[in-house]
């Protein structure tokens, strides 16, 4: 390569930076360096100017250049770089970090440039005039035009005087937010100087919420060299302005990838050659591997002959001659490169280089670092630095051992690929990869390779690798000196094994035995340990991926498994390298809250097996000993009698199928023990059956008893004439005989379960209502039986009055209440059973061969699925476990988690959820969470915990009975004692009021009978029958009335709590909205005469008829309705691209149009509105090429979306609607807006609740923009958006902790935990079965006004329950003293039958009071509208407070203004505000692409249909 000639006199000499941009000039052509001084510049700031005061004389520079040309050993490549670039770089660093660009006046003639600046915050024409006046006064501004409607400014300026960034700063100083619009003109300096700004656009996939945007903007904005970051959630892209001499697009991409997202460089503005910093970077890479010693006597040569070492490289990715020149010019500049020749045809490069200055690896990295960044370099012999003519191999050194953790291996093919490729790398002696443990042990030469290079090589193969341990020990091999004559044995090196090639330089290495990596690691470090972290703040799958990917890159971390719903992370780590607290700190650095769970040991596997073939105790011992000796099994117990084995194991080490295989290997057969499905512990069928039988038995024998009792209460003038009073035998009347027979059956059959419950209660030292019931009935029965036996024994003339009528009445009413109680409990528990029914029963576990080819498929029960299994899921099947997609693409219905109807795109690496439905393609997934660790199991746990936290309605009565029962027993005992004392003191009192006893009975007996009678009367009349009926009867009547009004209320708990509700939380999709997408607008973008509306609808409807997407179904349904037909045209070549749109060819629509026109008749109002349309008379079939989708889909197909169309789409998207573009035959011809419309009564229901003093909150898994749009329509001020089911539960608990009673209104499976946790859960009748079962109240008619009606009815019912309780208490307060004989002195005394009658009367009074609820009438719609008339006002966006996920920071709209009523102003993310000045100035760029749809579940992206 020749040196460039001198420039002509008078022309300015190029700076070092400009020289590097000229492909015809090398590094050695620099004759003069420019230094920079500060001088007053535009707007009071300073800008650089050129001065030659500090330039060295030409002689000095010439001497320097001559030394380089001569290859003097005194001048190194680092000196070259520092000498050439230090002054320029030093100054450009200072200026660029302050946001200014280098001024090159005198180097390049002045010229003007045009640019566009986006401005946020303008509200009127006064703002426009202020900005125009301020900016036009700046030096270098030619003209400026500000548009209020477009929120932008068109500026023409002189780049050499002022930059767009300086203009932006001036506008921001006025109080507005300004940023350079994307895609506009850049300054001249940025096109020439590699040290100025460049822009790169990256496609970022995996963002699901605004927190993802904030996370990316915050982290990337803090990187050195990043000027501005703008992330679009809807477009799934990031536009980054950066300084290329500090950071490269590949670095930005890697940083975003490390955060858990998938980033791809779409396009960039890159320098055409290497800048000074790029060269410095390449120079720094030379220190990776130490160069061989340099012969100081040779000048830039390796051999006495002075010739360099030749190296042949294969270079892929070259496309034209410019690629060849790019490589030759830039690589030829590197120190140590003597010559380079690149061949485009053979895709090779021959380099003559000096190995003392540059290594083959550095050359490879230098070529691959050249723009555009798509060159791939490989060595023909597969080893770096082993060129064919290499004569000076490096000196050998002692080998080292390292252990890698490798994630992503799925089969033996992965193991062979890694071992085959890594073993060929230079310096690698041997490698052993272990699939089960996910590790690799490598023996390598540290003088020829580096652990980080090996780790990067594994990652280049598509796996994730991290370094666990390193060990470099000098005693592993002998010392080999160059002049030693001692053989390997004498030197201490082991003799190579048979078949093992000697290593270069006579180095021999130990063979790595194929054993567990844990044993290999034990020689260098301790065994890995496992810790568990509690993590909060995760909102979506990208948070999980973010944590897993970043932790796995940390040294010492073996594996990471994060569970989103459980909020836990399982980390396997090397305790020598890292500790749990450090891991928690790493998670905290990622922006999450993390704490080490000290006492948590993880969930061990539990397996119950049926074993056949056992004959004696020896078989049991053999099985148990075999299992207990197996690593990973913590417990094993085998029962010979039942042929069952109970095994506990660590799922990290061993799985259920492995245990089954172990048992079969020793000669027995094992299978999964049959278990009762749907969680038998939640089933109340046994209790329901027993209390039902108890009630029916008591009823059958109790009805005659009650009939006879009523008969005896009828007044009779001749009481002795009754047939029932006749004695069968002396002392035993017919009535008492019938009472005895009936009561005996009731006492011992119908009352059996009461005796069981009372016994259990007394055994635990408690006295509840069961004890009181049993005590009262038993004493009444025993007393009646005793006095009847005595009367018969004494042959009394009259049969005594007994209490045989008391037990049947008590048992009938109480058994009925218990039966109803357990029925309600069973209905509540059915929610859990239905949740469990979502779980698949079997999984298709596959075995993969090379290239992921399925070798074998096996149907495995869910209990036998192990972590790490590869599972195949076909279209329409359920995902059996949580996992990651290994192969295939599909759409998954995850509504059970998100509650949103839109399917989610799944591709390799995506997370899938157990219980969700696979909608389209067949996929292979890797199981990550199985058994109780799945997301579905966590939801079941949430619902179960919420339900268990609720006390049953009987708890209050039981608590009251805990005091009432002992009190009544004491009163009864005191009554007995007092009357005994009174009777013996004054027998006349007893004789006066006690029925005439038979002759021959002593006074003492009379006194004891009377005292005992009063005591029994107290127990009978004080029985809590009325208390037990007060609530259940009101509940039964109230729920019946509610059901008649379209409200299903489950039990007394919701009725009791609903009147206390102070906060109502509404879900969005399916609750506030209909949950079904509908077309809200069709906008034609072409002339009606060219393409009529009916033809557009016919074509679009035909195209969408082949789509299964919910939006496509909605569009098809609309087109059929508008065309008045059920048949559409013919669709061919249909192709659907998830996340973008569809393309197809449509024909045969002419007959549909002609038929529609014949059936249409007179023009409709819709036709009059759109204008007359020409009829279709062309009989020939026309074929249309159709594209339907989002902006990105149109861009991919070469169509331009104009600003007017973008504005129309943005207008709909800010309202929470999805805008779809339609192109026919390559022409953008229409836009269709699809929305999930708000229910008509939603706003009225919200207003009525507010007028009742109830706070209303909207909580949804949808994005915050859609949530805000819905909230403004219905009048809700507080919104929680982008929340998970666990977040909904947490929000309910948060409000409950503030002392508020919370009602949750929802319709989906994802709402069921919150419905169960809330004080009152209200489900929409059209919702899922799980939600309906988990809720306390169900709105059968799907009318939100019924939420108001349920609260209103609750208040009426609770008032009635309180009245019933007052009546019951009054009865007891009056009846107990009367029964005790307190009022005997005034002549008031109760006979035993009177006590029974009084008890019955109290029950009847309570029942009649409850029946009054049947007169309730629900307020009608007219009444609600009359109350709301003149008071309902719409909300603006600024009046709605939005919180995202578990974030308690408010996401309010901008300050209220007239602009709020017509436009939505994008929010400024908070994270970039923490970055440098430039990021703060540009963080408010208008993101028009935020296309959240009401129908999207967890993706802020327009869904293709």
Curated annotation (Swiss-Prot):
Cross-referenced SUPFAM superfamilies: Calcium ATPase, transduction domain A, Calcium ATPase, transmembrane domain M, HAD-like, HMA, heavy metal-associated domain
A Pfam family it matches: HMA
Domain of life where this protein originates: Eukaryota
Places the protein is found: Golgi apparatus, trans-Golgi network membrane; Late endosome
Region (Disordered): 1-23, 36-64, 289-309, 1158-1179, 1475-1505
Binding locations of Cu(+) 6: 616, 619
Protein topology in the membrane: Multi-pass membrane protein
Positions bound to Cu(+) 1: 124, 127
GO BP terms in the entry: copper ion homeostasis; copper ion transport
Keywords: ATP-binding, Copper, Copper transport, Endosome, Golgi apparatus, Ion transport, Magnesium, Membrane, Metal-binding, Nucleotide-binding, Phosphoprotein, Repeat, Translocase, Transmembrane, Transmembrane helix, Transport
Protein residues bound to Cu(+) 5: 540, 543
This protein's GO CC annotations: late endosome; trans-Golgi network membrane
Molecular function via GO: ATP binding; ATP hydrolysis activity; copper ion binding; P-type divalent copper transporter activity; P-type monovalent copper transporter activity
Composition bias type Basic and acidic residues, residue spans: 1475-1491
Record-listed E.C. numbers: 7.2.2.8
Segments of skewed composition (Acidic residues): 51-63
Residues recorded as bearing Phosphoserine in the entry: 519, 1438
Signal peptide: none
InterPro entries: ATPase_P-typ_cyto_dom_N, ATPase_P-typ_P_site, ATPase_P-typ_TM_dom_sf, ATPase_P-typ_transduc_dom_A_sf, HAD-like_sf, HAD_sf, Heavy-metal-associated_CS, HMA_Cu_ion-bd
Function: Copper ion transmembrane transporter involved in the export of copper out of the cells, such as the efflux of hepatic copper into the bile.
Domain text: Each HMA domain can bind a copper ion, they are tightly packed and closely interact with each other. Wild-type ATP7B can usually be loaded with an average 5.5 copper atoms per molecule.
Cross-referenced PANTHER family: ATP7, ISOFORM B, P-TYPE CU(+) TRANSPORTER
Similarity comment: Belongs to the cation transport ATPase (P-type) (TC 3.A.3) family. Type IB subfamily.
Name the record gives this protein: Copper-transporting ATPase 2
Organism name: Ovis aries
Gene name of this polypeptide: ATP7B
